[in-house]
């Protein structure tokens, strides 16, 4: 059922304060960028008008997306609360830039498959990005949503940006899908608005006193002191990789054939197989340099808690928890792919539960100073891998007259690398999965010389 309005309670911005979004590490912006070829006869003015109309429709029906995020109550040993408050609309509603002078024609970008080296955030993004914190100000408010359209010869890049305390990856992609719906001339259904504007305050039932909390100590990061300063990793850069549909299927078949029977693991997924492959190869090339077979490596997978909590995919708040698998360097080098994938799936089956999400939320809720909590905790980029996969998410909808995007990308923020991070983006209509990873030059050079790696992975750059 379509609607032109919404319930009055949606305007109560207090309903959008949740628990998992209270981490100071989320005081950042998340970006997803979609490049499009300009259809014949479609003007820039028409695209801009359609985008602005879409943003107006979203602001009118999703009040929290029209606001900004502020931190209140912060003090000694207390990280405060992140809440959304009203904010005047930006003028103009979206950022528009003509960057034709700085880019080759879009057909050339298509031919090169939009490598990361071409995607300069100084030109294509309206603001900074994770892991760089954003500070709210009168001149530049910490808006919940931002959108930039950057025009090149024959194409346009749309950069969708959301505030991370208010949305996880599901919410970021949800913002892009709302824009696509509005550009197709669709109204937002009552059921969609119910989830997008859902009351977040009690969406995760905390543990009761008689329910034991699980161990989440690995999410505590060490304090930064003179005695224990921040360790600066080797220089690292972001790279795009591609797994074709055939290679994804080949990896899954290989993993399935080399996995020993396990009653806890009735099956493994494509996600398990490709994650295990990357983990194995990353550590293999590092082991050749380090020769530390007994060193422990951690693979941390960000998991969407919606399904286990019975919450629809359209819900846009933070519902991420992490599942961790530990193996030694020796195991990762020597074990067949299927055994590594089996270990990962077993840990996921054990931890990807409603109880685990409730326990993690309780852990966060009980800690006044949440600045010590991080998804990666004591993350060591030389031994560990942090991963987020949305391989199965559909993010190639039709954006009205613009049609479907050609790629899913993220602007390149070269000054803020995060070594050993790995994103798997949604598969395109051809079944190809593009991956964004941040690796040291030594790691990337070694991988590109590894025949097993290059037989499975196309390097885009």
Curated annotation (Swiss-Prot):
GO terms for molecular function: acyltransferase activity. InterPro entries: CAT-like_dom_sf, Sec_Metabolite_Acyltrans, Tri101-like_N. Disulfide bonds: none annotated. This is O-acetyltransferase azaD. Its EC number is 2.3.1.-. The gene is azaD. O-acetyltransferase; part of the gene cluster that mediates the biosynthesis of azaphilones, a class of fungal metabolites characterized by a highly oxygenated pyrano-quinone bicyclic core and exhibiting a broad range of bioactivities. In the first step, the non-reducing polyketide synthase azaA forms the hexaketide precursor from successive condensations of five malonyl-CoA units, presumably with a simple acetyl-CoA starter unit. Induction: Expression is under the control of the azaphilone cluster-specific transcription factor azaR. Gene3D superfamilies: Chloramphenicol acetyltransferase-like domain. The lineage of its organism: Eukaryota, Fungi, Dikarya, Ascomycota, Pezizomycotina. Pathway: Secondary metabolite biosynthesis.
């Amino acid at each position: 059922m379509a609607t032109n309005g919404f319930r009055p309670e949606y305007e109560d911005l207090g309903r959008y304060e949740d628990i998992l979004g209270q981490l100071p590490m989320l005081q950042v912006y998340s970006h997803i960028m979609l490049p499009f070829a300009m259809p014949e006869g479609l003007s820039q003015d028409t695209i801009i008008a359609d985008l602005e109309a879409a943003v107006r429709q979203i602001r009118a029906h999703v009040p929290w997306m029209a606001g900004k995020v502020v931190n209140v109550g912060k003090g000694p040993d207390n990280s405060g609360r992140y809440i959304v408050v009203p904010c005047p609309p930006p003028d103009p509603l979206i950022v528009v830039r003509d960057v034709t002078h700085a880019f080759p024609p879009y057909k050339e970008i298509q031919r090169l498959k939009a490598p990361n080296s071409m995607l300069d955030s100084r030109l294509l993004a309206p603001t900074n990005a994770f892991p760089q914190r954003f500070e709210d100000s009168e001149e530049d408010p910490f808006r919940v949503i931002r959108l930039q359209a950057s025009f090149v010869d024959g194409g346009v890049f749309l950069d969708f940006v959301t505030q991370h305390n208010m949305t996880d990856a599901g919410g970021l992609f949800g913002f892009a899908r709302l824009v696509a719906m509005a550009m197709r001339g669709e109204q937002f259904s009552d059921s969609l608005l119910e989830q997008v504007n859902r009351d977040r305050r009690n969406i995760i039932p905390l543990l009761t006193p008689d329910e034991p909390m699980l161990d989440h100590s690995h999410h505590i990061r060490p304090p930064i002191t003179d005695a224990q300063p921040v360790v600066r990793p080797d220089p690292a850069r972001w790279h795009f990789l591609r797994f074709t549909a055939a290679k994804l299927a080949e990896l899954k078949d290989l993993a399935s054939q080399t996995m020993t029977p396990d009653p806890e693991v009735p099956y493994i997924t494509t996600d398990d197989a490709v994650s295990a492959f990357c983990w194995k190869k990353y550590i293999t090339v590092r082991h050749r340099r380090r020769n530390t077979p007994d060193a422990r490596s951690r693979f941390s997978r960000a998991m969407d808690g919606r399904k286990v909590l019975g919450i629809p995919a359209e819900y846009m708040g933070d519902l991420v928890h992490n599942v961790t698998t530990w193996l030694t360097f020796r195991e990762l080098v020597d074990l067949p792919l299927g055994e590594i994938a089996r270990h990962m799936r077993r840990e996921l089956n054990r931890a990807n539960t409603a109880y685990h999400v409730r326990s993690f939320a309780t852990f966060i809720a009980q800690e006044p100073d949440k600045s010590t909590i991080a998804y990666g905790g004591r993350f060591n980029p030389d031994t560990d891998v942090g991963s987020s996969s949305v391989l199965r998410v559909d993010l190639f909808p039709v954006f009205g007259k613009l049609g479907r995007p050609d790629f899913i990308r993220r602007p390149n923020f070269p000054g803020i690398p995060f070594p050993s991070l790995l994103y798997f983006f949604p598969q395109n209509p051809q079944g190809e999965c593009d991956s964004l990873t941040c690796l040291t030059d030594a790691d990337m050079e070694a991988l590109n010389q590894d025949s097993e790696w290059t037989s499975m992975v196309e390097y885009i750059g």
